[in-house]
Amino acid sequence: MRILFVHPNYHSGGAEIAGNWPPSWVPYLAGHLKKAGFDDIHFIDAMTLNVSHDELRKKFAELQPDLIGVTSITPSIYEAEETLKIAKEVVPNAVRVLGGVHATFMFRQVLSEAPWVDAIVRGEGEEIMVELAKCVSEGRWPEDRASIKGLAFHDGTEIVATQAAPTVKDIDSLKPDWSLIDWKHYIYIPLGVRVAIPNMARGCPFTCSFCSQWKFWRDYRVRSPKAVVDEIEDLVNNYDVGFFILADEEPTINKKKFVEFCQEMIDRGLNHKVKWGINTRVTDIYRDRDLLKFYREAGLVHISLGTEAAAQLKLDLFNKETTVAENKEAIRLLREADIFTEAQFIVGLDNETKETLEETFQMAWDWQPDLANWSMYTPWPFTPLFQELRDQVEVFDFSKYNFVTPIMKPKALTRGELLDGVMKNYRRFYMRKALFHYPWRGTGFRRRYLLGCLKAFLKAGVGRTFYDLGKAGYWGPQTKDTVDFHFDETRKIAEAQVADWEAAADRSRKHKERQEALRAQMKDRAADRNTANFVMPADAEDEFDLSAETHEARSAEHAAMACGGGKDQMVDAAE
């Protein structure tokens, strides 16, 4: 059986300004499928190679796949749907599957607007795809599709979601097949070397209200440091990778394993062969201040910090457990350790003004990170913050949910004024850095890296790809009143998806009511126990067993929920 994976052709001028990034989802899925005996696997990176729809038709006709898998984040969803629509035209007998975070949580929306999609994989895909491939290869599709956990599909006029599949418990068992990647296309511009995106863990124990990763991966699992370094050694020695970014939301959460990972990199001499970067939190920088130089020795050269907002009000709204002062100190600590710092700011909520935009610039310049990014607040439609702000959302064209297009309109600014304010911050920050910092700060690697970053910005700016400025028609302050973001106003939320949201909100409300009632009951019982005439109920020993074993079990259950585990992620269809 022939399996074809396609990465949809979507561009927005965001992270791609630093280079082309290899789609890691393909090697991880392919590796697990090959382990199960499916070895006829092909891959088309339509994004990196800018493959047109006509070229896709030709490739589909040539390959004649039996199973086609496409992924999608929110902004690329329409292109992913169109890719599978083309597949239906050219290879109608192929089973068409869509996965990724957007399809996982918005499956009713996707199946309503793209009925030609045969199935949606909900959640991490390795084990689900193996079961689906077996079903197709054994001729049991579509009759037995309902027996596969983690799918959603049309059954007549109904949209059906099967029971949620369990997460992959032993993630060390996942062996990605990097040979499917044509590595010459994936270059990290600042260093001019091949780049990869392996991962050390899945999930995140934090529940930031604007993020979806903790919901998608459901529980937090960390790989063996040795297994991760084995994978990196393979990438370096066999595919000539010179830079990698760990795909984790925060690889430093588990300090013990991160330290072991760094030591393993040093022990194998990989710190002299490959440089790398991570995303992490300010709190971890504080915690590890005495280890930062050790991390640098292990090859860690670039840390992107989720400082998120200059105003503490925004940090609180995003559930960020840091303060403005801590952000500044974290950047200073990294600078002392000779680790490049990238500060991330989120702008564009309803309380944004010209003054708050100016505040983020002044704060960025005061903190002096090596790099600064201003991202438009993008309300992922499956996050808690979206539900809180739902009445304020006017744009449902998901192709614009890309961190560079102002989805939300601030009360005091037009979208054009917001974009102009962000560009003003970029111009001032990088012009000053280019003139007074990058060419003169440090020697050797530091200078080369900073000038390489400047090259990436200039290349995207001259080509008008940065921040989608060319598409929007922005050429400077004089055009802020004429920019056109080309929102497709015909895009609406499907009735089935709205009903799903309302049902989820109702479940959440009832769960909260039960919790509040239980707290009140426990409070009343505690008050009763303090009275002189209190008599313990006959069944109290079972109900209030406070043995060490019970306490430990309850603590573990609570911890899982606090980390975003369990039913807060992906509710089974039966519930």
Swiss-Prot record:
The residues the record assigns to binding [4Fe-4S] cluster are C204, C208, C211
> What does the protein in this record do?
Involved in the tetrapyrrole biosynthetic pathways leading to chlorophyll and bacteriochlorophyll (BChl). Catalyzes the anaerobic formation of the isocyclic ring (E-ring) in Mg-protoporphyrin monomethyl ester (MPE) to yield protochlorophyllide a (PChlide a) via a six-electron oxidation and the formation of an oxo group at position C13 using oxygen from a water molecule.
Alphabetical UniProt keywords? 4Fe-4S, Bacteriochlorophyll biosynthesis, Chlorophyll biosynthesis, Cobalamin, Cobalt, Iron, Iron-sulfur, Metal-binding, Oxidoreductase, Photosynthesis, S-adenosyl-L-methionine
- The EC designation for this entry is 1.21.98.3
Q: Which GO terms describe its biological process?
A: bacteriochlorophyll biosynthetic process; light-independent bacteriochlorophyll biosynthetic process; photosynthesis
Return the similarity comment.
Answer: Belongs to the BchE family.
Q: Which reaction does it catalyse?
A: Mg-protoporphyrin IX 13-monomethyl ester + 3 S-adenosyl-L-methionine + H2O = 3,8-divinyl protochlorophyllide a + 3 5'-deoxyadenosine + 3 L-methionine + 4 H(+)
Biochemical pathway: Porphyrin-containing compound metabolism; bacteriochlorophyll biosynthesis (light-independent)
Q: Name one Pfam family in it.
A: Radical_SAM
Q: Which residues form the B12-binding domain?
A: 9-143
UniProt KW Electron transport keyword: no
Basic and acidic residues: compositionally biased ranges: 513-525
Q: Which PANTHER family match?
A: ANAEROBIC MAGNESIUM-PROTOPORPHYRIN IX MONOMETHYL ESTER CYCLASE (PTHR43409:SF13), ANAEROBIC MAGNESIUM-PROTOPORPHYRIN IX MONOMETHYL ESTER CYCLASE-RELATED (PTHR43409)
Q: What range(s) does the Radical SAM core domain occupy?
A: 190-417
This one is known as Anaerobic magnesium-protoporphyrin IX monomethyl ester cyclase
CDD domains from the UniProt entry: Radical_SAM, radical_SAM_B12_BD
Q: Name one GO molecular function term.
A: oxidoreductase activity
Q: Which InterPro entries match?
A: Cobalamin-bd (IPR006158), Cobalamin-bd_sf (IPR036724), Elp3/MiaA/NifB-like_rSAM (IPR006638), Methyltransferase_Class_B (IPR034466), rSAM (IPR007197), rSAM_horseshoe (IPR023404), Tetrapyrrole_Bchl_Biosynth_MTs (IPR051198)
Q: Region Disordered: list its residue ranges.
A: 504-525, 551-575
